Protein backbone atom coordinates (compact mmCIF):
# COMPACT_ATOMS: atom_id res chain seq x y z
CA UNK A 1 0.00 0.00 0.00
CA UNK A 2 3.10 2.24 0.19
CA UNK A 3 2.53 3.32 -3.41
CA UNK A 4 -0.86 4.73 -2.36
CA UNK A 5 0.16 6.42 0.89
CA UNK A 6 0.20 10.17 0.26
CA UNK A 7 -0.05 9.72 -3.51
CA UNK A 8 -1.46 12.36 -5.83
CA UNK A 9 -4.08 10.78 -8.04
CA UNK A 10 -6.22 11.46 -11.11
CA UNK A 11 -9.50 9.56 -11.52
CA UNK A 12 -11.34 9.98 -14.83
CA UNK A 13 -15.05 9.25 -14.68
CA UNK A 14 -14.67 9.77 -10.95
CA UNK A 15 -18.27 10.90 -10.41
CA UNK A 16 -19.60 7.68 -11.93
CA UNK A 17 -20.48 4.32 -10.44
CA UNK A 18 -17.08 2.70 -10.04
CA UNK A 19 -15.13 5.95 -10.21
CA UNK A 20 -16.80 7.55 -7.19
CA UNK A 21 -16.66 4.33 -5.19
CA UNK A 22 -12.97 4.15 -6.09
CA UNK A 23 -12.43 7.73 -4.89
CA UNK A 24 -13.87 6.71 -1.51
CA UNK A 25 -11.62 3.62 -1.41
CA UNK A 26 -8.52 5.66 -2.32
CA UNK A 27 -9.19 8.16 0.47
CA UNK A 28 -9.48 5.24 2.86
CA UNK A 29 -6.18 3.84 1.53
CA UNK A 30 -4.47 7.09 2.50
CA UNK A 31 -3.82 8.88 -0.79
CA UNK A 32 -2.92 12.54 -0.45
CA UNK A 33 -4.95 14.30 -3.10
CA UNK A 34 -7.38 13.31 -5.85
CA UNK A 35 -8.36 15.24 -8.96
CA UNK A 36 -11.55 13.89 -10.52
CA UNK A 37 -12.14 14.52 -14.22
CA UNK A 38 -15.80 14.02 -15.14
CA UNK A 39 -18.17 15.70 -17.60
CA UNK A 40 -21.17 14.76 -15.41
CA UNK A 41 -23.06 13.27 -18.34
CA UNK A 42 -23.35 9.96 -16.49
CA UNK A 43 -21.61 10.91 -13.26
CA UNK A 44 -23.60 12.50 -10.42
CA UNK A 45 -22.37 15.16 -8.02
CA UNK A 46 -24.10 13.31 -5.17
CA UNK A 47 -21.77 10.36 -5.73
CA UNK A 48 -18.84 12.53 -4.62
CA UNK A 49 -20.50 14.41 -1.77
CA UNK A 50 -18.86 12.33 0.96
CA UNK A 51 -15.44 12.35 -0.69
CA UNK A 52 -15.43 16.10 -1.32
CA UNK A 53 -16.10 16.72 2.36
CA UNK A 54 -12.60 15.30 3.01
CA UNK A 55 -11.02 18.39 1.47
CA UNK A 56 -8.66 16.13 -0.51
CA UNK A 57 -10.79 15.82 -3.63
CA UNK A 58 -11.26 18.32 -6.43
CA UNK A 59 -13.79 17.84 -9.21
CA UNK A 60 -12.77 19.19 -12.60
CA UNK A 61 -15.69 19.28 -15.00
CA UNK A 62 -14.35 18.37 -18.42
CA UNK A 63 -13.76 15.67 -21.00
CA UNK A 64 -11.12 13.03 -21.58
CA UNK A 65 -11.28 14.22 -25.19
CA UNK A 66 -9.72 17.53 -24.11
CA UNK A 67 -6.05 16.76 -24.69
CA UNK A 68 -4.63 19.87 -23.01
CA UNK A 69 -6.80 19.42 -19.94
CA UNK A 70 -5.85 15.75 -19.65
CA UNK A 71 -2.15 16.65 -19.82
CA UNK A 72 -2.56 19.45 -17.26
CA UNK A 73 -4.31 17.12 -14.82
CA UNK A 74 -1.85 14.25 -15.34
CA UNK A 75 1.26 16.36 -14.70
CA UNK A 76 2.70 15.64 -11.27
CA UNK A 77 0.39 12.71 -10.57
CA UNK A 78 1.66 9.46 -9.08
CA UNK A 79 -1.31 7.36 -10.16
CA UNK A 80 -4.01 7.61 -12.82
CA UNK A 81 -7.25 5.61 -12.78
CA UNK A 82 -9.11 5.78 -16.10
CA UNK A 83 -12.80 4.94 -15.67
CA UNK A 84 -14.48 7.39 -18.07
CA UNK A 85 -16.56 5.85 -20.87
CA UNK A 86 -19.96 6.04 -22.49
CA UNK A 87 -22.43 3.20 -22.17
CA UNK A 88 -22.64 0.33 -24.62
CA UNK A 89 -26.07 1.36 -25.98
CA UNK A 90 -24.90 4.91 -26.66
CA UNK A 91 -21.86 3.56 -28.51
CA UNK A 92 -24.24 1.76 -30.86
CA UNK A 93 -26.35 4.89 -31.39
CA UNK A 94 -23.43 7.31 -31.79
CA UNK A 95 -20.33 5.45 -32.96
CA UNK A 96 -18.38 8.61 -33.84
CA UNK A 97 -18.90 9.98 -30.33
CA UNK A 98 -17.86 6.56 -29.03
CA UNK A 99 -14.66 6.76 -31.08
CA UNK A 100 -13.88 10.23 -29.70
CA UNK A 101 -14.57 9.35 -26.06
CA UNK A 102 -13.51 5.71 -25.81
CA UNK A 103 -10.58 5.63 -28.23
CA UNK A 104 -9.23 9.18 -28.64
CA UNK A 105 -9.98 9.91 -24.98
CA UNK A 106 -8.09 6.83 -23.84
CA UNK A 107 -5.22 7.71 -26.18
CA UNK A 108 -5.01 11.12 -24.45
CA UNK A 109 -4.82 9.40 -21.06
CA UNK A 110 -2.11 6.98 -22.21
CA UNK A 111 -0.10 9.71 -23.93
CA UNK A 112 -0.26 11.92 -20.84
CA UNK A 113 0.47 9.10 -18.36
CA UNK A 114 3.52 8.03 -20.38
CA UNK A 115 4.67 11.58 -21.11
CA UNK A 116 4.43 12.73 -17.50
CA UNK A 117 5.90 9.46 -16.20
CA UNK A 118 3.18 8.51 -13.74
CA UNK A 119 4.04 5.52 -11.54
CA UNK A 120 1.09 3.51 -12.74
CA UNK A 121 -2.09 3.65 -14.80
CA UNK A 122 -5.05 1.45 -13.89
CA UNK A 123 -7.72 1.49 -16.60
CA UNK A 124 -11.16 0.01 -17.10
CA UNK A 125 -11.84 -2.58 -19.75
CA UNK A 126 -14.84 -4.88 -20.06
CA UNK A 127 -16.01 -8.44 -20.51
CA UNK A 128 -17.57 -7.07 -23.71
CA UNK A 129 -14.25 -7.77 -25.44
CA UNK A 130 -15.14 -11.48 -25.44
CA UNK A 131 -18.55 -11.12 -27.05
CA UNK A 132 -20.38 -14.41 -26.60
CA UNK A 133 -17.58 -16.50 -25.12
CA UNK A 134 -16.96 -20.12 -26.11
CA UNK A 135 -15.27 -21.26 -22.91
CA UNK A 136 -16.61 -21.11 -19.36
CA UNK A 137 -15.33 -20.00 -16.99
CA UNK A 138 -13.82 -17.50 -19.43
CA UNK A 139 -10.10 -16.81 -18.94
CA UNK A 140 -8.21 -13.69 -20.01
CA UNK A 141 -6.64 -15.49 -22.97
CA UNK A 142 -10.01 -16.08 -24.63
CA UNK A 143 -10.02 -14.46 -28.10
CA UNK A 144 -11.93 -11.29 -28.96
CA UNK A 145 -13.28 -12.48 -32.33
CA UNK A 146 -16.86 -12.97 -31.13
CA UNK A 147 -17.44 -9.39 -30.03
CA UNK A 148 -19.65 -7.41 -32.41
CA UNK A 149 -20.25 -4.26 -30.34
CA UNK A 150 -18.52 -0.95 -30.96
CA UNK A 151 -18.07 -0.62 -27.20
CA UNK A 152 -16.27 -3.96 -26.96
CA UNK A 153 -14.13 -3.13 -29.99
CA UNK A 154 -13.11 0.17 -28.40
CA UNK A 155 -12.18 -1.61 -25.15
CA UNK A 156 -10.13 -4.19 -27.11
CA UNK A 157 -8.29 -1.40 -28.88
CA UNK A 158 -7.73 0.40 -25.56
CA UNK A 159 -6.06 -2.74 -24.23
CA UNK A 160 -3.91 -2.91 -27.36
CA UNK A 161 -2.94 0.75 -27.05
CA UNK A 162 -1.96 0.29 -23.40
CA UNK A 163 0.24 -2.70 -24.26
CA UNK A 164 1.91 -0.79 -27.07
CA UNK A 165 2.56 2.24 -24.83
CA UNK A 166 4.12 -0.15 -22.32
CA UNK A 167 6.36 -1.52 -25.09
CA UNK A 168 7.20 1.91 -26.50
CA UNK A 169 7.64 3.94 -23.32
CA UNK A 170 7.74 1.50 -20.40
CA UNK A 171 4.39 2.80 -19.11
CA UNK A 172 3.30 0.76 -16.09
CA UNK A 173 -0.34 -0.20 -16.44
CA UNK A 174 -2.96 -2.73 -15.43
CA UNK A 175 -6.34 -3.07 -17.12
CA UNK A 176 -9.42 -4.54 -15.52
CA UNK A 177 -12.13 -6.30 -17.49
CA UNK A 178 -15.25 -5.64 -15.44
CA UNK A 179 -18.06 -8.13 -15.76
CA UNK A 180 -21.61 -7.17 -14.64
CA UNK A 181 -21.16 -4.42 -12.07
CA UNK A 182 -24.14 -3.60 -9.84
CA UNK A 183 -24.75 -1.80 -6.57
CA UNK A 184 -25.23 1.68 -5.13
CA UNK A 185 -24.59 4.58 -7.55
CA UNK A 186 -24.91 2.26 -10.55
CA UNK A 187 -25.72 3.72 -13.95
CA UNK A 188 -29.45 3.06 -13.97
CA UNK A 189 -29.71 3.28 -17.77
CA UNK A 190 -27.44 0.34 -18.57
CA UNK A 191 -28.68 -2.81 -20.30
CA UNK A 192 -29.13 -4.97 -17.21
CA UNK A 193 -29.16 -2.23 -14.56
CA UNK A 194 -32.32 -0.77 -16.07
CA UNK A 195 -33.97 -4.17 -15.64
CA UNK A 196 -32.95 -4.21 -11.97
CA UNK A 197 -34.50 -0.78 -11.42
CA UNK A 198 -37.78 -1.79 -13.08
CA UNK A 199 -37.91 -4.90 -10.91
CA UNK A 200 -37.36 -2.90 -7.72
CA UNK A 201 -40.14 -0.51 -8.75
CA UNK A 202 -42.57 -3.34 -9.41
CA UNK A 203 -41.76 -5.26 -6.23
CA UNK A 204 -42.11 -2.13 -4.09
CA UNK A 205 -45.51 -1.53 -5.74
CA UNK A 206 -46.58 -5.09 -4.91
CA UNK A 207 -46.28 -6.30 -8.50
CA UNK A 208 -44.19 -9.27 -9.64
CA UNK A 209 -40.89 -8.65 -11.45
CA UNK A 210 -41.34 -9.27 -15.16
CA UNK A 211 -38.94 -11.36 -17.25
CA UNK A 212 -39.26 -11.58 -21.02
CA UNK A 213 -38.56 -15.18 -21.99
CA UNK A 214 -37.30 -17.91 -19.65
CA UNK A 215 -34.74 -15.74 -17.84
CA UNK A 216 -32.06 -18.39 -18.15
CA UNK A 217 -29.43 -16.07 -19.66
CA UNK A 218 -26.65 -15.62 -17.12
CA UNK A 219 -24.29 -12.92 -15.91
CA UNK A 220 -21.35 -12.73 -13.56
CA UNK A 221 -22.29 -9.98 -11.12
CA UNK A 222 -19.68 -8.04 -9.19
CA UNK A 223 -20.53 -5.47 -6.53
CA UNK A 224 -19.47 -1.82 -6.98
CA UNK A 225 -17.22 -1.73 -3.90
CA UNK A 226 -15.49 -4.95 -5.01
CA UNK A 227 -14.79 -3.47 -8.46
CA UNK A 228 -13.39 -0.34 -6.80
CA UNK A 229 -11.21 -2.43 -4.47
CA UNK A 230 -9.78 -4.27 -7.48
CA UNK A 231 -8.47 -0.93 -8.76
CA UNK A 232 -6.79 -0.16 -5.43
CA UNK A 233 -5.18 -3.61 -5.35
CA UNK A 234 -4.03 -3.25 -8.97
CA UNK A 235 -2.37 0.08 -8.17
CA UNK A 236 -0.69 -1.27 -5.04
CA UNK A 237 0.58 -4.45 -6.71
CA UNK A 238 3.89 -4.81 -8.53
CA UNK A 239 2.05 -6.30 -11.50
CA UNK A 240 2.41 -4.45 -14.78
CA UNK A 241 1.36 -5.01 -18.41
CA UNK A 242 -1.46 -7.20 -17.10
CA UNK A 243 -5.14 -7.48 -17.96
CA UNK A 244 -7.54 -9.12 -15.51
CA UNK A 245 -11.13 -10.29 -15.26
CA UNK A 246 -12.90 -8.57 -12.38
CA UNK A 247 -15.94 -10.61 -11.46
CA UNK A 248 -17.35 -12.83 -8.75
CA UNK A 249 -16.69 -16.06 -10.62
CA UNK A 250 -20.32 -16.98 -9.96
CA UNK A 251 -22.92 -17.43 -12.66
CA UNK A 252 -26.36 -15.96 -11.93
CA UNK A 253 -29.35 -16.22 -14.25
CA UNK A 254 -31.79 -13.34 -14.67
CA UNK A 255 -34.39 -15.57 -13.04
CA UNK A 256 -32.15 -16.21 -10.02
CA UNK A 257 -31.43 -12.49 -9.80
CA UNK A 258 -35.15 -11.64 -9.75
CA UNK A 259 -35.78 -14.28 -7.09
CA UNK A 260 -32.91 -12.96 -4.96
CA UNK A 261 -34.33 -9.44 -5.25
CA UNK A 262 -37.76 -10.67 -4.15
CA UNK A 263 -36.18 -12.27 -1.07
CA UNK A 264 -34.15 -9.17 -0.24
CA UNK A 265 -37.23 -6.95 -0.54
CA UNK A 266 -39.28 -9.32 1.61
CA UNK A 267 -41.79 -10.16 -1.11
CA UNK A 268 -43.49 -13.52 -1.58
CA UNK A 269 -44.54 -12.78 -5.15
CA UNK A 270 -43.46 -15.08 -7.97
CA UNK A 271 -41.61 -13.93 -11.08
CA UNK A 272 -43.90 -13.23 -14.03
CA UNK A 273 -42.81 -14.26 -17.52
CA UNK A 274 -43.65 -12.34 -20.69
CA UNK A 275 -43.02 -13.19 -24.34
CA UNK A 276 -39.34 -13.43 -25.26
CA UNK A 277 -37.88 -10.31 -26.85
CA UNK A 278 -35.05 -10.08 -29.33
CA UNK A 279 -32.19 -11.69 -27.47
CA UNK A 280 -29.04 -9.81 -26.60
CA UNK A 281 -26.25 -11.76 -28.31
CA UNK A 282 -24.53 -12.59 -25.03
CA UNK A 283 -26.59 -15.17 -23.17
CA UNK A 284 -23.92 -16.41 -20.80
CA UNK A 285 -21.19 -14.84 -18.68
CA UNK A 286 -18.92 -16.58 -16.20
CA UNK A 287 -15.40 -15.36 -15.49
CA UNK A 288 -12.31 -17.27 -14.53
CA UNK A 289 -11.06 -15.02 -11.72
CA UNK A 290 -7.95 -16.98 -10.76
CA UNK A 291 -5.44 -14.60 -12.39
CA UNK A 292 -6.69 -11.57 -10.44
CA UNK A 293 -6.59 -13.63 -7.24
CA UNK A 294 -3.03 -14.76 -7.96
CA UNK A 295 -1.49 -11.49 -9.18
CA UNK A 296 -3.57 -8.80 -7.47
CA UNK A 297 -4.85 -10.62 -4.40
CA UNK A 298 -8.38 -9.79 -5.55
CA UNK A 299 -11.40 -11.88 -4.72
CA UNK A 300 -14.97 -10.58 -4.73
CA UNK A 301 -16.24 -10.42 -1.14
CA UNK A 302 -19.81 -9.14 -1.33
CA UNK A 303 -22.41 -11.87 -1.84
CA UNK A 304 -25.29 -11.19 -4.23
CA UNK A 305 -28.04 -10.81 -1.63
CA UNK A 306 -25.92 -8.54 0.54
CA UNK A 307 -25.12 -6.40 -2.50
CA UNK A 308 -28.75 -6.27 -3.58
CA UNK A 309 -29.75 -5.19 -0.07
CA UNK A 310 -27.32 -2.25 -0.33
CA UNK A 311 -28.63 -1.46 -3.81
CA UNK A 312 -32.24 -1.32 -2.60
CA UNK A 313 -31.25 0.90 0.34
CA UNK A 314 -29.51 3.33 -2.03
CA UNK A 315 -32.28 3.29 -4.63
CA UNK A 316 -35.38 3.73 -2.48
CA UNK A 317 -34.94 7.42 -1.58
CA UNK A 318 -33.87 8.16 -5.18
CA UNK A 319 -36.71 6.23 -6.80
CA UNK A 320 -38.68 9.17 -8.20
CA UNK A 321 -35.59 11.05 -9.30
CA UNK A 322 -34.28 7.98 -11.14
CA UNK A 323 -37.64 7.23 -12.77
CA UNK A 324 -37.86 10.85 -13.97
CA UNK A 325 -34.53 10.60 -15.81
CA UNK A 326 -35.56 7.50 -17.72
CA UNK A 327 -37.61 9.22 -20.43
CA UNK A 328 -35.15 12.04 -21.01
CA UNK A 329 -32.03 9.89 -20.98
CA UNK A 330 -29.04 12.17 -21.61
CA UNK A 331 -27.82 11.70 -25.15
Q: What does each model-found stretch correspond to?
A:
Residues 29, 201-331:
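C-terminal substrate-binding subdomain of Rossmann-fold SDR/epimerase-dehydratase oxidoreductases
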Residues 108, 186-187, 217-219:
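Heptad-repeat alpha-helical coiled-coil signaling segments
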Residues 26, 109, 165, 195, ...:
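A short, amphipathic alpha-helix embedded in the catalytic core of nucleotide-handling enzymes
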Residues 18, 195, 253:
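Conserved alpha-helical elements of sugar-nucleotide-dependent glycosyltransferases
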Residues 157, 161, 165, 195, ...:
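Hydrophobic alpha-helix immediately C-terminal to the catalytic Tyr-X-X-X-Lys motif of short-chain
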Residues 188-195:
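Conserved catalytic loops of nucleotide-sugar-dependent glycosyltransferases that act on lipid-linked
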Residues 1-181, 302, 310, 314-321, ...:
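N-terminal Rossmann-like NAD(P)+-binding domain of SDR-like oxidoreductases, especially those catalyzing
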Residues 183-185, 279:
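Short beta-strand->alpha-helix junction loop in the catalytic core
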Amino acid sequence: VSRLEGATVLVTGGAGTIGSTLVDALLEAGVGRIDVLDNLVRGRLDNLAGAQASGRVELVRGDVGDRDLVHDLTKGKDLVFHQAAIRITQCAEEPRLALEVMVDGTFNILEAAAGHKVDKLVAASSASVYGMAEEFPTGERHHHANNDTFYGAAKSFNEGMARSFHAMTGLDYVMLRYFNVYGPRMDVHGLYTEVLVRWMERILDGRPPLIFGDGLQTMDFVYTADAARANVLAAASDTTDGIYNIASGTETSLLEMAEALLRVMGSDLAVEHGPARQVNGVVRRLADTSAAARDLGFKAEVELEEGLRELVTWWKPLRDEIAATRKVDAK
